[in-house]
Design a protein with these regions (language model features):
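Conserved active-site segments centered on acidic
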Residues: 1-83, 155-161
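Phosphate-binding/catalytic loops
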Residues: 82-85, 91-161
Length: 161
């Protein structure tokens, strides 16, 4: 399998997308596939650039043995040519990412933009809810959803040529 380049995107890049990045990195490390993937995360907004993931999300992930290594950054046009897939957490993220990508036109070689939940195997959610303004349970629920979706994504990528 050729190296796959995956970018996870949410609003501020401090809760959902760094959690998705961390979960996916955890899964590929467990399978010994680190050399087959480039994984990153970004936000559609730039408010938190340079900051680590939200402390509550980091704590919830650490309880599952998942490390969240990234620092917040904002998605940029170069990401559409640097990554194979861009996975968004909700409809607003999807709409904003697609709008940004339209600036590059419809040329070949651009990243495929998809909702993260399209890879869920057990959950029927249509979006990954933002836990930022909620309590501890919201962070746990997001991690449950992301573990499901990241597992489905990995299965799909390993099956594709």
């Amino acid at each position: 399998m050729a190296e796959q380049r995956i970018l996870f995107v949410c609003l501020g890049n401090i809760c959902r997308s760094p959690a998705a990045e961390g979960v996916f990195l955890h899964l590929i490390a467990r399978e010994g596939l680190e050399d087959q993937f480039v994984v990153d995360s970004a936000g559609t907004g730039g408010w938190h650039v340079g900051n680590p993931a939200d402390r509550r999300m980091r704590a919830a992930a650490e309880r599952r043995g998942i490390h969240l290594p990234s620092r917040a950054r904002q998605i940029e046009l170069a990401d559409f040519t640097s990554f194979d897939r861009i996975l968004t957490m909700d409809d607003d993220n999807l709409r904003n990412v697609k709008a940004l990508g339209r600036e590059l036109g419809n040329r070949p070689g651009l990243a495929r933009v998809e909702p993260m939940t399209s890879y869920c195997r057990q959950h029927s959610a249509t979006h990954v809810p933002d836990p930022y303004y909620g309590g501890e349970q919201g962070f746990k629920d997001v991690l449950d959803l992301l573990e499901d979706a990241c597992g489905g994504l990995l299965e799909t990528l390993l099956r594709s040529p």
